[in-house]
């Protein structure tokens, strides 16, 4: 839990600007619910915090103006970052999906791990049987 607090604190430091957004509190039951089915915890124009539940691989993603921070709380996954996105298609401004990554780095994520994926970095849950994580997205202006 201390690691999660550190991750959220890091996200807040990245976001230090004018007036702070309101404090958001969610009790343990709602956090568990968010983790069980991929649910939003809080969001505003500067950041988003969600519980992410995965039982299968995903698509390659790239966010031009968003840094993703993941804190794994259960399970494991093979997560690929960097390299070149293959068959990239823009889904909306600044957001891309693809089918594969060429030349990326593989990370074996497990409980307790944190990974920070800077904006403009392809990333991909390549192999997953179960991986629950907190995801913090920090938006660049």
Regions found by a protein language model. Name each.
Residues 56, 93, 123:
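Short histidine
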Residues 70:
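Structured binding elements
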Residues 13-65:
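A short, N-terminal "cap"/entry segment at the start of jelly-roll beta-barrel domains
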Residues 76-79:
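Short beta-strand segments in beta-sandwich/barrel cores
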Residues 84, 89-119:
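Short acidic-glycine-tyrosine-enriched beta hairpin
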Residues 108-113, 119-141:
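Ligand-binding loop in jelly-roll beta-barrel domains
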Residues 3-13:
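Sec-dependent N-terminal signal peptides
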């Amino acid at each position: 839990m201390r690691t999660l607090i550190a991750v959220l604190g890091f996200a807040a430091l990245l976001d230090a600007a004018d007036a702070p957004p309101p404090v958001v509190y969610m009790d343990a039951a709602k956090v568990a619910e968010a983790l069980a089915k991929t649910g939003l915890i809080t969001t505003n124009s500067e950041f988003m915090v969600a519980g992410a539940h995965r039982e299968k691989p995903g698509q390659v993603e790239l966010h031009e103006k968003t840094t993703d921070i993941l804190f794994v709380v259960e399970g494991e996954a093979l997560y690929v970052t960097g390299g070149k996105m293959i068959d990239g298609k823009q889904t909306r401004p600044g957001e891309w999906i693809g089918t594969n990554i060429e030349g990326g780095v593989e990370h074996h994520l497990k409980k307790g791990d944190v990974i920070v994926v800077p904006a403009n970095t392809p990333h991909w849950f390549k192999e997953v049987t179960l991986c629950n994580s907190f995801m913090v997205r920090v938006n660049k202006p």
